[in-house]
Amino acid sequence: MASTCQRLSFYVSPLKRQLVSRPPVILWERLIPGCSRSIYSATGKWTKEYTLQTRKDVEKWWHQQIKEQASRVSEEDKLKPKFYLLSMFPYPSGKLHMGHVRVYTLSDTIARFQKMRGMQVINPMGWDAFGLPAENAAIERNLHPESWTQSNIKHMRKQLDRLGLCFSWDREITTCLPDYYKWTQYLFIKLYEAGLAYQKEALVNWDPVDQTVLANEQVNEYGCSWRSGAKVEKKYLRQWFIKTTAYAKAMQDALADLPEWYGIKGMQAHWIGDCVGCHLDFTLKVDGEDTGEKLTAYTATPEAIYGISHVAISPSHGLLHGCSSVKKALQKALVPGRDCLTPVMAVSMLTLQEVPIVIMANPDLEGSLDSKIGIPSTSSEDTRLAQALGLPYSEVIEASPDGTERLSGSAEFTGMTRQDAFVALTRKARGMRVGGHVTSNKLKDWLISRQRYWGTPIPIVHCPACGPVPVPLQDLPVILPSIASLTGRGGSPLATALEWVNCSCPRCKGSAKRETDTMDTFVDSAWYYFRYTDPHNTQSPFGSALADFWMPVDLYIGGKEHAVMHLFYARFLSHFCHDQKMVKHREPFHKLLAQGLIKGQTFRLPSGQCLKKEDIDFTGPAPVCAKTKEKLEVTWEKMSKSKHNGVDPEEIVAQYGIDTIRLYILFAAPPEKDILWDVKTDALPGVLRWQQRLWSLTTRFIEARTSGTVPQPQLLNSKEKTKAQNLWEYKNAVIAQVTTHFTEDFALNSVVSQLMGLSSALSQASQRVVLHSPEFEDALCALLVMAAPLAPHVTSELWAGLTLVPSKLCDHYAWDSGVMLQAWPTVDSQFLQKPDMVQMAVLINNKACGKIPVPQHVAQDQDKVHELVLQSELGMKLLQGRSIKKAFLSPRTALINFLVQE
């Protein structure tokens, strides 16, 4: 849209300067005849200023009406194209913070825009309600986590409503309710049946005093428990994992189909790593006896598996430290600092080859591996080790005369090229469920076990005879039992609910016990976007038809801190559901908007303690501690209670109004950048002035059109018509730019700037242009409609005022409907047909005298540019009657210099 940008720049720059320098226009109170559709319907008065009280009155009046408008869905709406807008749902902590306000202001603004564009929009809201914080908060208050959570949800729902945010509340979900976690359990069982959910021993953080497992977040920087203060120990426990590595290659490859994931694709790709190898499974033997245990090891060259010599493990491997039956044999063979051959044998479940396990001297294997398959044919290091330990092996790769490498001594893969054998062998391993999923050497499977109460119960029954058995689907949900007293100590709380734990095996009907771990809350949020498409379904997690209609999410908004883990798990579940034939789309999110933080000013003592503002002396050149006079380190950091740098959203809204805070958040920085919260900066005064200008412009228009004079466009003189034409061009340029920002880069700060510029241009119009010009009326209407998603309350009031004006000149607006129900403005076809323009600088005797617009296709034609300058208003004023000696047109810049007789 080169022409748009060029035409827009002609008007925006000087008008921006005028906007900053000019004081706001203030009108005295005046009676407006026939005013019947605004908050001033009783008196018909418009106040002289858009004061805080006026803002509050406007917002109070329009709040409920706007909410009702947003919630109405007609049969006609259901025929419109879909737009699925999703903002990351919050953990119900009990109180919204400014980060919530920012993300939900962004989603609300874009949702309103898309509705005005004629889209069928869902903008759902729910609650990520399980998790450790709720459990700990409930323990501290001697409450049950459920009552604490539900109370918080109720309060935060009211807060969202008071902020004027319009969500699709009919789609609300809460992850801690059985009607949701039933389907989380269902998906877990589907993963288990597909061989993608399994148990193995893994290291956990263990508090020896409280006798409980700690999350990483509960271990401080000194390695001590946040609660007891005890030194945290590492302990092996049997844990549940989801085999995310099985989808590593598919997810890595699918990133190429996500061009809109700016900045995030690289983070996802780095997290997954280079998918060049796979894991393969082995059974373990000691003294010729099968132990029944399994070992998984990685190789970057699975095609050469028939040349295996050993399986290497690191000294930190779980087999050496957990409860494995081979632990003693391995420890007996271990000599620290040396590569140690052990009596434990690994039997390939793919080829049935039997090789020894070697404990490596180096604790760090490649990537994040703790086990690796040794294949001398493809690794000089493996060759060195095999020869040093006297391990037999076969060379299985032969080079052809043409340089092609082929396999030998490799069963049915013999004669294949390495590339073909890689594909065939990994496919066979996957079919046998003994590994073969192409992945990297750094990606690990997802540990989902949590030894806590407040989470989704894992739907597995442990039977002495049958082993782990999934709960039958018809018996879901496995309801989280009520536990009278939670202490946060003593291991998994569910283990104390004996009536719940003790059960019958679904398979053999013998005595069994339920799994007492709960799921990581990331599992709940890994599929919630599906549930929003069909939130009341009682027969399945979601209906395929509805999911196929709404998915993928058109725009997903949330913090950049979730760009790796949450997005990875969500993508994994989506890929899995696709392979289960539950949905036709593999990727869940089309576009991402990772918004920045809102940071507050932090004042820190040399000791590291953060001070409240009331404990700081600001009278000197630099802030100091009021009590000790110590100098303070001043930084901008993420808002938090502990840093005393936060602001209460409700307090700040009460002080400035909803629309003002919305505009400040949108205008202060691009969405992806951090906002340094400081209401003394230009951003807040700027949006306050702009609202006043919108108010003044509308009032001026109403006054002109209700003065008793009928508008007659033919009465405008040529100069006034030119001004009106300029407004028409400016309006079209702004529509094009604003629409692009809303749909492409989401630079809503630029949207506000563009609309400020259009407001300033309108304020320069003469009274006759305001009265008689259809271009002025159209530009003002377009301005209010485009501002409506940003500031819905004030624009609703101003639009209600516009509808009172008699003898309207524009018939393409729905005058009997509110501003939020207007169609989004479009660029006039005549504007698109106009030639691209450049701003040609005009110099006279080397002195800059101004600029004129010149069609781009003639900008390098000196004769035509010369003629256009002479015909322009600027040329007639400065060159008419003067003797022009010569003119020079710059070949590099848009500049023409006239040398004239003095």
From Swiss-Prot:
Keywords: Acetylation, Aminoacyl-tRNA synthetase, ATP-binding, Ligase, Mitochondrion, Nucleotide-binding, Protein biosynthesis, Transit peptide
Principal subcellular localization: mitochondrion
Motif 'KMSKS' region mapped to chain: 638-642
EC number: 6.1.1.4
Listed GO CC annotations: mitochondrial matrix; mitochondrion
N-terminal signal peptide: none
Domain of life assignment: Eukaryota
Positions bearing N6-acetyllysine: K67, K235
Chain positions recorded as ATP binding sites: K641
Sequence motif 'HIGH' region, residues: 91-101
Record localization: Mitochondrion matrix
MF (Gene Ontology): aminoacyl-tRNA deacylase activity; ATP binding; leucine-tRNA ligase activity
UniProt-listed InterPro entries: aa-tRNA-synth_I_CS, aa-tRNA-synth_Ia, Leu-tRNA-ligase, Leu_tRNA-synth_edit, M/V/L/I-tRNA-synth_anticd-bd, Rossmann-like_a/b/a_fold, tRNAsynth_Ia_anticodon-bd, Val/Leu/Ile-tRNA-synth_edit
A Gene Ontology biological process term: leucyl-tRNA aminoacylation
Catalytic activity: tRNA(Leu) + L-leucine + ATP = L-leucyl-tRNA(Leu) + AMP + diphosphate
Family membership: Belongs to the class-I aminoacyl-tRNA synthetase family.
Protein name: Probable leucine--tRNA ligase, mitochondrial
Organism from which the protein derives: Mus musculus
Species classification: Eukaryota, Metazoa, Chordata, Craniata, Vertebrata
